[in-house]
Amino acid sequence: MNTLHILFAKFRRRALTLAKGIGALLLSSVLLAGGCQQNPSIDQATGAQDAESTPALVTVSPRKSPNDTREYRYLTLPNQLKVLLVSDPETDKSAAALAVYRGSFHEPDSRPGLAHFLEHMLFIGTETYPAVDSFQQYITANGGSSNAYTALDHTNYFFDIKNSALAEGLDRFGHFFIDPLLSPEYVEREKNAVHSEYQMQIKDDGWRGYMVSKQALNPEHPGHRFTIGSLDTLQGNVKADLDRWFAQNYSADQMGLVVLSNASLDDLQALVEPLFNQVPNYNIGPDYPTVPAYTDAQLPAMITSQTQKNAVRLSIAFPVPSTLPYYRTKPEQYISNMLGHEGEGSLHSLLIQRGWIESLGAGTQSFDRNTSLISANFELTQAGSNHVPEIMGLFFAHIDMLKSVEPEAWRYTEQAKVAELAFQFQERGSTVGFVYQMAPRLNEYPPEDLLAAPYLMEGFKPDLIKDLLARMTPENVLVELAMPDFQSPTVEPWFAVPFALTQGPVPVAMPDNPPLNLPAANPFLPENLSLLEPDDAPIDLAVDQPGLQLWLDTDVSFTTPRANIAIELAVPGGLISLRDASMARLFTRLVNDELTQSTYPALLAGLGYNL
């Protein structure tokens, strides 16, 4: 079974908010799932509600971009299952995702990987559709695909399919959560499938780094555990544990469904409501870890580990109180945007000039409902690997510079403008990508903000910014350094990664008067976003002279205020040798590096280039 683990939503250059993935996702293909069995018995005394006796709640229309032509409707079914319906008459595929707000955090200590194992078992069959693997066969036969992943705090199931087959596809999908068979005769097969995924990841540097990072967590926190599962962790009478865990954790009040199709909202509601209202509701309520992820006993700390690939990575992370309650104002984004800036006078620019890094990115991620991580990731050069204390010193000097000045409203306003532009003119991805990203969001934000939440910056809160900065100190830091030539007699127990954990002061060489400056105002932020008048004239050859031709065309059909400019430089004689091609490639990389400082503000404003 193929597995994708999003470990470090990798810090990409020029990104506004990215994340270090200690709260990673385990994404597993369902192509090998199979089997059938009786639905586990559920004790009705646990509080299952009669869905017919509870009226549906009032529907809500989430606020959306003015350029978004889709229609949205949020509703809560009588059984308390949250639903977001999306009508897109232009889509050629329908898609659906259901997130269960229970994941690896909620497993018993004795059964690491049980949530992931249940994810596999649900695809085997249901009482209504008992044929083994029939769901996947139906989806594939109708031009679609399906998948699922198990995260720390939720499990997410999703599929896409041609529009005409949505009704039956959704019915088959819904019965995963109504009458799954969880067949005992397929337990061994799926245990082996889970174990195979575990074995596949043992040499993966993302997984290796993720597992090593757990060594610095509070051992009482559920995030400290192994999560994939293996033959060892799933041995014995796992079927009884599986049935019990399903009955205790898969309840309608802790589920969120997103359905996108070309049908109208009324038609989608008529399809979804009678089906998913059958999912039992046991009113189990939310369940989040209460144990702190890190205590004074864990931090400060530095973990050094071995990589398989020839790459050196440095991560510097600060646990802070969860920033999720402040999603409308995002004080953490003010900080990460400053730390990750790549313009003149930035930390990125200085470290590039010294030849110590290949890239730098900064961002924030929620680890659990109590803790967020503000972090920076560096990809180091070979020279940089010999200057880690100096790099850390410059990083803390940059933080000290931010602390030395009051947070500035004009900077926040500028960042809010960038976020507003990103929301207003966002480009659509795949339908299935949209639904599986939205399903967990139904548990994080109020209905009216489901679409806008990641982009909102609606109030400058300098005190919140200063409070976060005050927590970004060498005494409250987790440093992770991964390099290929590191050796240690201590190995991580599940992935056998050589590592060393040092708890106590981290190596920081503070510089004297480093040449660091805060970013200047961005001159590229647009003021006028009105579209040009439609022009049916043919493409115009505006300039035609020796060595230069310029063609112009006006196209407002995409209703976005963007211009695409393509410039082709003709090389006399062409690239006729391997050396010519190599030199041209090297030239473009050098030019791109040279332009980074001057073009970064333009990139933040939505202007991009590719050489």
Residue ranges and their predicted role:
Residues 181-199, 264, 283-297, 364, ...:
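Acidic/histidine-enriched alpha-helical segments
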Residues 95-160, 203, 207, 224-230, ...:
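M16/MPP (pitrilysin/insulinase) zinc-metallopeptidase core fold and M16-derived inactive scaffolds
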Residues 124-128, 160-191, 370-427, 572, ...:
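M16/insulysin-pitrilysin zinc metalloprotease superfamily fold
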